[in-house]
């Protein structure tokens, strides 16, 4: 009753193919497990499905098995598709034991098996290159670099994920393999050997030799990375002309060429020196590990390098050493360059944050904040925001706030509140942080606050109003941001040290050009009622007048912002008197919102609907209102007789039960044909009707 043997050929039906794949994959893994347990051997199985998914089984650590494979001298037995083309089921393992001749078979089979091995080494190479090669160098060569270790690990999953489709490409490229392989054998391995010994000792010096093999593939990359071209001279040996050919192959069929290159080491392994070449292959893998470093690094700065990265992954086979050599070239100069450059790029946001924080702390120290200012601009977003800042630069102190606020308004202002010794300003500024965030948007959306200031200024100076209107029209949004920011900066500077008020006045004098009207516009907002003399005092930039006007302007600006943002904040203590005098405009706005919640709280308690207040709701109106709506329910719910009553009704319901036994009473009760039923059954029918209706109601209610 032997099983029916099927013809071994590609299955065209997708459904049948998927089912066969699942069943045979499971059987293969099961067989591998049984083999590993029964014979105490290590087994690793890789399957790259047509869906580009990787399936694997390993009796132990997959990476260890792959590393062992890479360092192994050569396969004592190798099987290829041609060995099983007889059409017999693979289940018959009898024939498998005989071919220890495969070593000579390897020698003989290799020329044909560049195609045959195309799939074989791809499987093997797929296996070890994606996962094994990165782990090996990560453990050994990368420690000197240190950078590559995590990066080497990161590309591994990519290597694993990508190989599936690329394996197919490699299979397609198998004919290309023999061409690439001899080149790799002649050149790649010789250099790889040199690479092999030294890389473990000193990776950076070996980078140039790696660079030498690298140039074939890096040439396309060298235009991207000029530093690499100097390294190509290291390999200028005849290898380079062959390597350009390899480059073409890599470009056209990098995956394919690399696969044959890998294959080349496999055919020689039976020979002793070729085994050594494999060992040499493994070190390039170490260097390939450097390659993984490049892919993360390069993508940071050079998107162009990212396409070669897929090539690296495509190269997953030992040719990766080729790519890896190339990459090491890029790695040494570019790694340092990329690492140095991308590191500043990556840390820049962090450094910028730190710098901004330091600037916030340094804002009292104007020169320090300025260099930091120069640092944040390099990122484009910061540059845009710094562009807003330059007009405020004449005011040295406000600049940090502008830059910081442009980047991060909250932390600096918070720090302002922290550094400022003002008692109440701390809390106010901390509260204003949210207000300031809302303010720039609200100010941008609504310049009426500025119009208020202009209207107030009308009493002070009409010419200044015209200039202010022009300024508003020219750039209302940036000055708004700056205005909101200078408030915090001025408040922190002027209030923090008493000697500081002079610098704010200086900043006002410096801002005398276009920004002066802006500052004046904001300041008279508070002091408009106090008198136009305050604005003139600021224009005069007297130290005392400047200090008082700055403090008041801060408070009023904050008040205006609060009025716009509906934020309730107390005025700063130092300017409390001025605020009280000007209280008609600014201060009452913040106090008004506070007081309404305080006073209306009782008012709301009185005016609030009964539903809002449970006590009153229950005591006064709740019970009577339902009584008015549902008198029956009130009697039932309030009397507490409803509980027993439903029980009592339940018994009559039982009585109605017999009526349901097709007595006419229940039919009458259900259909409510009272006139007929009443005439027939008299008052008894009435009772069951009422009883039946009531208990039903009770049930629905309950």
Swiss-Prot record:
It is found in: Nucleus. One of its GO terms (cellular component) is nucleus. Residues 132-144, 201-241, 587-600 have a biased composition (Pro residues). InterPro entries: MADS-box/MEF2_TF, MEF2-like_N, TF_MADSbox, TF_MADSbox_sf. Its main location: nucleus. Residues 73-608, 658-702 are annotated as: Disordered. Disruption phenotype: Leads to reduced aerial hyphal growth and conidiation. Does not affect appressorium formation but impairs infectious growth. Residues 145-155, 273-284, 326-343, 350-371, 487-512, 530-553 have a biased composition (Low complexity). One of its GO terms (molecular function) is protein dimerization activity. SMART domains: MADS (SM00432). It holds the Pfam family SRF-TF. Residues 693-702 have a biased composition (Basic and acidic residues). Residues 1-61 form the MADS-box domain. Induction: Expressed in conidia but not in aerial hyphae or conidiophores. One of its GO terms (biological process) is positive regulation of transcription by RNA polymerase II. Residues 180-195, 456-465, 554-567 have a biased composition (Polar residues). The keyword Transcription regulation applies. Residues 86-96 have a biased composition (Acidic residues). Keywords: DNA-binding, Nucleus, Transcription, Transcription regulation, Virulence. Transcription factor acting downstream of the MPS1 MAP kinase (MAPK) cascade during conidiation and plant infection. Required for overcoming plant defense responses and the differentiation of secondary infectious hyphae in live plant cells. The MADS-box domain is essential for the function but dispensable for nuclear localization. Interacts with MAPK MPS1. Belongs to the MEF2 family. This is MADS-box MEF2 type transcription factor MIG1. The gene is MIG1.
């Amino acid at each position: 009753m032997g099983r029916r043997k099927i013809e071994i050929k590609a299955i065209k039906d997708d459904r049948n193919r998927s089912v066969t794949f699942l069943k045979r994959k499971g059987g293969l893994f099961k067989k591998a497990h049984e083999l590993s347990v029964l014979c105490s051997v290590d087994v690793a199985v890789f399957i790259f499905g047509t869906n580009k998914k990787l399936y694997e089984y390993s009796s132990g650590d997959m990476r260890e098995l792959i590393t062992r494979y890479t360092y192994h001298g050569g396969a004592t037995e190798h099987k290829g598709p041609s060995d099983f083309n007889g059409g017999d089921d693979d289940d018959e393992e009898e024939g498998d034991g005989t071919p220890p001749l495969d070593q000579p078979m390897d020698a003989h089979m290799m020329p044909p098996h560049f195609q045959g091995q195309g799939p074989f080494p791809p499987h093997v190479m797929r296996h070890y290159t994606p996962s094994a090669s990165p782990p090996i160098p990560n453990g050994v060569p990368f420690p000197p670099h240190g950078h590559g270790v995590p990066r080497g690990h990161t590309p591994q999953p990519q290597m694993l994920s990508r190989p599936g489709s690329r394996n197919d490409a490699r299979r397609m490229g198998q004919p290309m393999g023999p061409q690439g392989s001899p080149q790799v054998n002649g050149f790649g391995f010789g250099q790889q050997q040199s690479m092999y010994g030294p890389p473990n000792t000193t990776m950076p010096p070996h980078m140039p030799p790696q660079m030498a093999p690298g140039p074939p593939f890096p040439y396309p990359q060298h235009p991207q990375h000029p530093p690499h071209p100097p390294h190509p001279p290291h390999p200028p040996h005849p290898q380079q002309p062959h390597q350009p050919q390899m480059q073409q192959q890599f470009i056209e069929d990098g995956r394919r060429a690399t696969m044959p290159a890998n294959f080349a080491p496999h055919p020689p392994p039976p020979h002793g020196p070729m085994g050594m070449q494999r060992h040499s292959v493994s070190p390039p893998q170490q260097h390939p590990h450097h390659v993984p470093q490049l892919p993360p690094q390069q993508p940071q700065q050079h998107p162009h390098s990212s396409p070669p990265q897929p090539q690296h992954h495509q190269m997953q086979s030992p040719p990766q050493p080729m790519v890896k050599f190339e990459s090491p070239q890029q790695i040494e100069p570019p790694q340092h360059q990329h690492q140095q450059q991308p590191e500043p790029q990556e840390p820049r946001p962090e450094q910028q944050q730190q710098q901004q924080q330091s600037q916030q702390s340094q804002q009292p120290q104007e020169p320090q904040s300025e260099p930091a200012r120069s640092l944040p601009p390099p990122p484009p977003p910061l540059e845009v925001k710094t562009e807003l800042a330059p007009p405020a630069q004449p005011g040295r102190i406000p600049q940090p706030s502008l830059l910081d606020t442009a980047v991060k308004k909250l932390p600096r202002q918070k720090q302002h509140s922290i550094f400022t010794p003002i008692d109440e300003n701390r809390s106010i500024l901390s509260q204003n942080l949210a207000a300031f965030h809302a303010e720039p948007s609200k100010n941008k959306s609504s310049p009426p606050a500025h119009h208020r200031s202009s209207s107030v200024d009308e009493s002070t100076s009409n010419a200044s109003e015209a200039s202010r209107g022009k300024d508003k029209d020219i750039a209302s949004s940036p000055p708004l941001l700056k205005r909101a920011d200078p408030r915090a900066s001025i408040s922190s500077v002027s209030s923090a040290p008493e000697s500081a008020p002079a610098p704010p006045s200086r900043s006002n004098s410096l801002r005398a050009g276009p920004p002066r009207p802006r500052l004046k516009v904001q300041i008279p907002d508070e002091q408009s009622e106090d008198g136009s003399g305050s604005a003139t005092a600021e224009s005069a930039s007297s130290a005392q007048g400047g200090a008082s006007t700055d403090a008041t302007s801060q408070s009023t600006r904050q008040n205006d912002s609060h009025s716009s943002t509906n934020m309730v904040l107390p005025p700063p203590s130092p300017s409390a008197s001025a605020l009280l005098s000007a209280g008609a405009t600014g201060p009452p706005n913040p106090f008004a919102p506070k007081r309404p919640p305080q006073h209306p709280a009782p008012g709301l308690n009185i005016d609030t609907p009964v539903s809002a207040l449970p006590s009153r709701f229950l005591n006064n109106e709740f019970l009577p209102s339902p009584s008015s709506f549902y008198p029956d329910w009130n009697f039932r719910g309030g009397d507490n007789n409803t509980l027993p009553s439903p029980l009592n009704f339940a018994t009559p319901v039982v009585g109605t039960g017999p009526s349901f036994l097709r007595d006419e009473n229940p039919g009458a009760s259900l259909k409510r044909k009272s006139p007929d039923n009443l005439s027939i059954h008299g008052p008894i029918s009435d009772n069951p009707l009422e009883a039946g209706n009531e208990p039903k109601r009770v049930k629905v209610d309950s």
